[in-house]
Amino acid sequence: MSVALADEPLIDLEEDLEDGEIDDDEEDEQQSSKIQVQKKTFVGDDDVQFVGVEAKNQNDDEDVVYVGPSTDAVCLQNSNSTKSKKPRPLEDDHASSIELAIANALKKKGIEPPMPRMRSSNQDTSDQSLEGSGEGLATANPLLQSTRSSRRRKRKKEREREQKKDKEQQNRSRRDENDVSVVPGGVEDMDEYEMMNVRGGSPPPGGAAPPLSSCGQRFSGADWDMDDGSAATGAAGLGAGGGGGYNSHSSYDSYSDEETNGPGLMNQRRRTRRDNEKEHQRGVNNRKRRDRDRLEGGLAGSGSKRNRRDSGEGGGGGQEKMGGSNRVEPRKLELCKFYLMDCCAKRDKCSYMHKEFPCKYYYLGMDCYAGDDCLFYHGEPLSEQLRNVLLKHMETAPKEILGDFKRISRDIAIVQMTRRHEQLCDQLNRENTWNSIGCGLMGKRQDHQMQQQQQQLQHQQLQQQQEQQQTQQQAAADGGGCIPSLLDMVINPPLSENKRKSRWTEKMGAKAAAGAAGSSERDSTSPDAKPLPPHLDLANLSHVLSAENMAKLNKLGITNLEQMLQVPFGQLTEAGLTLVEIGEIQRKAEDAKPQTQAELESSTPPSKRETEANNSNSKSNGLIMVDYTQYLKDAHVSFSGNDPLDDDRDDDEQLIIDDGNDSTAEEDQQPKKAKAPPAATHESSTEEAPLPSVFDLPSFMNNMLGQGSSARQLLPASATSPNQENAHLPGGDQSTHKSAPIGGGTSTNVLGRILFGDKQSDPEARAAFYRDIIRNPFKAHSGDGDVDSSNENSNSNSHSLTPTPTPEPGSQSPKPEDHDQDMPELPVIAPALPPTTPSLYVRRSMYDFDPVKEQEHGRQELLTEEKEQYQRDTDMRLPFEPMKHYMPATEIDAAIFSHTPIRWQLHEVTIEESSYAQIRASALHKEQRELRDPRMRRILGLPETPDNSGPLGSVPIMGPSSFSVDNIARCATTIASPDLETAVRDSTPSSPPPSVVNLPSMSVPPPSMRVPPPNIQVEKPTVRTDPRRDPRRAVLQAPTKGASTANTTAPNASGGSKQISEIRSLLQVSNWYNNLGTNNKIMVNQQLALVFTELKKFHQLPNDAPKIFDVSFIVNNTTLQQIFAKLFIFVDDNGEVVQIPEEPNGNGAALGGGGDSGGGVGGGGGGGGVVLPNLSQPPPNLSQMLRLPPPNIRMLRMSGMMMQMGNVGPPFNQPPPRGGLMGMPPNGNGLNQGVGNLGGLGQLGINQGGGPVPNGNPFNPFGGNNGGGAGVMNNMNSMGNMGMGFNNFNNNGGRGGHFPGGGSGGNGNGNNRNQRGGNHRNRNI
């Protein structure tokens, strides 16, 4: 055993590498065979040199390798460190011997194993322990030693080995099971592995699968028998001769040159290093997939990792375009739904189609909404396989995958895909290799159905011809060989088994597959259909369609109106188009159509095969079966012959018409020579106009109204359209005309002159006549034509034979006396029709009027025409504009084709929403007595007005809910409950009292006789109850209400909660309270909490106990008095909250009239103020006096008297002043705490005219009465009896509090707590 050591430190690969692992992760550069001895270089600690061991013989069992750091370049055995002296496990020895054998075999072949380089000393590189021979390695450097502890490294490796052994044992059973089904079940195994994201490299260049062995040997020795060139260009990219065709990114990276007989275990370990643990566990299964690839011929090319999108040639064929001849399709020709959601974890390794799946929109000829960002393939023409994949996807994919794409039928998709395919082939100069769409793309089931349909069509045509010949012979025998008359035809119904197919999906496919221009109901003589003219392309309808609508239609593959015909109405609406949009498209498109287009364009209308329903002889029952489709040929309308909605004309809807009585029609036969029978069934020539479809109803109406009206003005009565009216007589086969004798004395005289006059009538007049006949098929008397679902939608003037009154002139009942006006083109017919001649086809039914009444109704309709334009239709017609692409059920005729719709016009009107806030704001500025409507007061949240009709016109004693009328402005944010104040509202008249009633001045106290004693119940006069209330409820509650209103001393069961709620509601609607700052509101609530507590205690006392509410705490608390003054309330000795009405006269403001603006009581023009009396606990004999509200003492205007009153002692029975904790305030007596100079004007804000108010303006503590401007609240009067001034916490002292740091106003001194800069919110109002 020859061993050579390098100069660099040696790594003990026994410790760093696991059992026979080969690490080739970082083999970015292929080692050349010239590098047999590595150069002596000093690198970092991570750059290492490896010891290669070569066996002298091929006996692998004798080779036991010890690898470690060495200091001697000659003797390897002496250089082994202590860490490697222990015998290696058997697995390591076996792996090393196998690698040695591989290296020796390669050397004998002339191939030098490459020398892989290591990234670091900590990474496992078991491959490189066997690379190179002993003579190919340089001597080791004795100075550099491995720094890692061998014991620690050994323990770590042992733990890793144990873990890997456990995992291998768990996976060994799986590998054994997979080995059993390698050959027969290779495809299934491969699918499973691809689902696990397991991907391997390309097969070796041998191309043949090696024999499988239990030891996991991958390749035989013969696989490596190649020269340098073949190895370099092999599919595996193995660089022979050390030249390096191999790199770490090779598609066959799981193998190296020297592992010809290497077990699969090594590859599993390498895969663990390269990928993840899951791929490592599936290493053996990857070998099976590579073997199968080798059997299939393998991949050739650059040797990169095999991609599932690789083509058959060129290795990296993932970029090859779609549809290539060498394209290898994925096994799963289905779209990956996870890729669609952008969450496929397998990515390129997924077995389903990702990016290569063809885009539905692109290959159907639509505009892909995603554009360049589309997830699917755009580009070259599809192969037939991918075409079928896309067709299957559109048919079977669930709604979740299709998304917004509207599912279309297979046949429509084939047509669109073929058109797109031809365009792509032309653009790219490719050959169109697709099979015929009509035959090759149809399945066996479709082919069978097509054959059956063709056979049925031929059978029907033969039967039709026979029946026509019979009818012609019979007509010739009955009519003496004359030309058959219009009403002489006998028509057999079509075969019952030939009902129309599904109107939504399969009908167009059957027609396209048949290769005929018409449907299965069309004559064989009909030529191929012509597409719509190019001016009806959607690209030319930009004035009709918006960009959004155009995108919607392009999304469905619709580029012109012909394609829109093929799309069902429901699908158009699902695509986002509204009924208005669809109708507007068609209406404007037909308006834009040239007038001569209808005359020049001609195609064959599909004629109905009609048979007699009951009896071939119409003489027996007087009934005939008439084809109605020919009627519409007179309307100058030309349409495509391949109408996709022809199945709507295929129904067995034959109109049974009573032909009057049995008589001959010889006199009608001569006029018929000059005019074609409109109702006759023809094998029409190509010059006749085709039939309109349901889709083209508006064109019929527009031509009748627009083009027809111009034609009526330009053409004489005898002028007709020769291309459409008379061409079918010389061009058609006269033997196909069917006729039956019809008796005709008086019945046919008028009818013949109407229908077949000596001169041909104007086409529009005739079309109007036909339209009215067609309108109601259930009215058998109403005409001689059947009704199709696509033949009636006109608004022109007509002679209706049905009594269906509508506002429209074109849908009105007959007006016989107006015939001369309606039909100026019929000079022969008009005299023949007396004004009162009834219709000869009248047959009584439940829908019809009496003929006499019908005549009278026609006369009345002339007078009421304009009025009826705004009324609803009377015979259940649609009340809207006709929908242009409407497909109603044709089993009945109760739709727009038998009931002409009314034209409605929608006018958009903007109505301002009701703003109750503005109403409330406007109510604030009105005289509040004007708003007496209780409904408006409830809407605005105002209390209902009390009954002010007491004796002497005085204000009665108000109960707890007796809010003043003048308090409307303070109740603007809540809606009053109807049962909240029952005591007063039940006694309030429902109608508003006269507005002239004026409340008395508060300066006049109410008479004492109105005040009852405390414990004496006073009966109130009976008043009217609110009529809006339930009378039964009023009766039940009357005794209770009377008792509760009479007994004012009854205790409140809720314990004063009603009084508390009243005070709170007054707070919420008070502008003064709402404009206060947060701190001031807290202070007000704290003061009112004292009142609430006393009210609760008082009202919880027994009812029979004599009780008088103690108001002494209110009298002694000036802050409470000021709060009550601001709220205009006081609490009487019964514990009830009474509101003080404001002063109604205008010479001065009411109580605190200037209070909201910072002024004091008596603001404005110096109005009087109010000083509350001292309502401390009185002696018992004064209890009755204390029930009175506080007297309203009007203040004198003389400033001297005001000064005198302001400087006197305690006024009106107030207790003497008491000092607070800090003593008496500096500039005032006990009452004027914190009040500044009282003598000057302008001290109280806006109270300029009246002078100062005594007592320091006790009712406006928040108004700023210390020399500040209006709205200043710099110094609040003392709170309670503490004698402590209250500073404004929100605004700065002086200067209105608008700016920080304002100069001291009066005694404010600017010492406020909240010196908030820029506080422009003036809360002192």
Curated annotation (Swiss-Prot):
Annotated Pro residues bias: 1003-1015
Compositional bias per record (Basic and acidic residues), positions renumbered to this chain: 159-178, 499-509, 1021-1033
UniProt cross-references to InterPro entries, sorted A to Z: Su(sable)-like, Znf_CCCH, Znf_CCCH_sf
Signal peptide: none
Biased composition regions of type Basic residues, renumbered to the chain: 149-158
Region (Highly charged): 138-327
SUPFAM superfamilies: CCCH zinc finger
Membrane-spanning parts: none
Spans annotated as Disordered: 1-36, 74-326, 499-535, 588-622, 639-695, 710-745, 780-835, 979-1058, 1143-1170, 1295-1325
Regions of compositional bias (Polar residues) in chain numbering: 119-131, 594-606, 710-726
GO biological process, one term: nuclear RNA surveillance
Post-translational modification Phosphoserine, affected residues: S524, S663
Main location: nucleus
Gene3D superfamilies the UniProt entry points to: Zinc finger, CCCH-type
Zinc finger annotations (C3H1-type) as residue ranges: 330-357, 358-381
Compositional bias segments (type: Gly residues): 236-246, 1149-1170, 1295-1309
Metal-binding recorded as keyword: yes
Acidic residues bias locations: 9-30, 644-668
Phosphothreonine PTM positions: T604, T664
Swiss-Prot/TrEMBL keywords: Chromosome, Coiled coil, Metal-binding, Nucleus, Phosphoprotein, Repeat, RNA-binding, Transcription, Transcription regulation, Transcription termination, Zinc, Zinc-finger
Presence of keyword Ligase: no
Function: RNA-binding protein that suppresses transcription of some RNAs. Together with Wdr82, part of a transcription termination checkpoint that promotes transcription termination of RNAs and their subsequent degradation by the nuclear exosome. Promotes transcription termination of aberrant RNAs, transcripts from genes containing a transposon inserted at their very 5' end or RNAs from heat-shock-inducible repetitive element. Binds RNA preferentially at a sequence that resembles a cryptic 5'-splice site.
Subunit description: Interacts with Wdr82.
Name the record gives this protein: Protein suppressor of sable
Lineage of source species: Eukaryota, Metazoa, Ecdysozoa, Arthropoda, Hexapoda
